[in-house]
Amino acid sequence: MSNEADLLHGPLEDRHRDLGASFAEFGGWLMPVSYAGTVSEHNATRNAVGLFDVSHLGKALVRGTGAARFVNSALTNDLNRIGPGKAQYTLCCNESGGVIDDLIAYYVDDDEIFLVPNAANTAAVVEALQGAAPAGVTVSNLHRSYAVLAVQGPRSADVLAELGLPSDMDYMAYADTSFRQVPVRVCRTGYTGEHGYELLPPWESAGVVFDALAAAVSQAGGQPAGLGARDTLRTEMGYPLHGHELSPDISPLQARCGWAIGWKKEAFFGRDALLAEKEAGPRRLLRGLRMVGRGVLRAGLTVLVGDTPVGVTTSGTFSPTLQAGIALALIDTDADVRDGQKVTVDVRGRAATCEVVRPPFVAVKTR
């Protein structure tokens, strides 16, 4: 682990320590990994509600005349599919079709788009957009201007309603409100596969919102949850994590994120390369693996058909919901691997039998 003094620190670290959190480095930040234990936090989120501090996530603002039009010419998804008050999953690609980052774009109005990239990639996204921005459009890095608090799980709406926060909104919609004189953006978004919300209060006022949420979450039978549970939850959903399922060398098509590309748009970063890859077909595809026997899968393991290597795992964990080892893996398309087929994974010299499945591993309940 990196020296804590060399890492960036969130606005709520003292509160997490008071709650007994254990910490680890993630994206250059010192973040809470668990409190009562990853499995307990995972199950609380699936069955009741979990509260996550994900303030390490980036924030950026694109503002100026035609800001939405500019962002639409740069990021992959088509902003014309949504409008003010809605959010959209999208990607910032390089010219070879690899992924600089995946992020959420919040459509404020035609002249203002708010972005939430991943922690480690915020500067790269801002730099890419600044380099292409037309006169009159500014791109600002607001990484430490806002905290991000995720309330996720079947009782998440009850938690927000208890506090008088807006909860009755469509998936991927958002609303700007005020809570105890603190401005808060409440978004119907998340990274767990459950009905949930992400709240963005100002960095310096995050404690007021966190304390109220923590009390309401506890009252609803939930608990604080760390990045360990966030990872097991997103892996069960098959959601990509940049640096694992997406990277400058892993394209959206390979990661099965082609749905987040506006193919009919005239311009976006990496368009020519991605159109060529779409025409030829990706050389590898992201698939799910579920262990047949006992054990845990991790990233970086070789996947084989017989004695022939056909791919590599990109993420792996033990699924608390399924009580089985699961993984995401990039599999060569010319290996002609099919869903339901058995493959083996080399787990430190042991051949582990796995079934190929199409994620998500458990039912999606976001809506």
UniProtKB/Swiss-Prot annotation:
SUPFAM superfamilies: Aminomethyltransferase beta-barrel domain (SSF101790), Folate-binding domain (SSF103025). It is an enzyme of class 2 (transferase). InterPro entries: GCS_T, GCS_T_bac, GCST_C, GCV_T_N, GcvT/YgfZ/DmdA, GcvT/YgfZ_C, TrmE/GcvT_dom1. Gene3D superfamilies: Aminomethyltransferase beta-barrel domains (3.30.70.1400), Aminomethyltransferase fragment (4.10.1250.10), Probable tRNA modification gtpase trme, domain 1 (3.30.1360.120). Signal peptide: none annotated. GO terms for biological process: glycine decarboxylation via glycine cleavage system. Its EC number is 2.1.2.10. GO terms for cellular component: cytosol; glycine cleavage complex. GO terms for molecular function: aminomethyltransferase activity; transaminase activity. Keywords: Aminotransferase, Transferase. Pfam families: GCV_T (PF01571), GCV_T_C (PF08669). It catalyses: N(6)-[(R)-S(8)-aminomethyldihydrolipoyl]-L-lysyl-[protein] + (6S)-5,6,7,8-tetrahydrofolate = N(6)-[(R)-dihydrolipoyl]-L-lysyl-[protein] + (6R)-5,10-methylene-5,6,7,8-tetrahydrofolate + NH4(+). Belongs to the GcvT family. The glycine cleavage system catalyzes the degradation of glycine. The glycine cleavage system is composed of four proteins: P, T, L and H. This is Aminomethyltransferase. The lineage of its organism: Bacteria, Bacillati, Actinomycetota, Actinomycetes, Mycobacteriales.
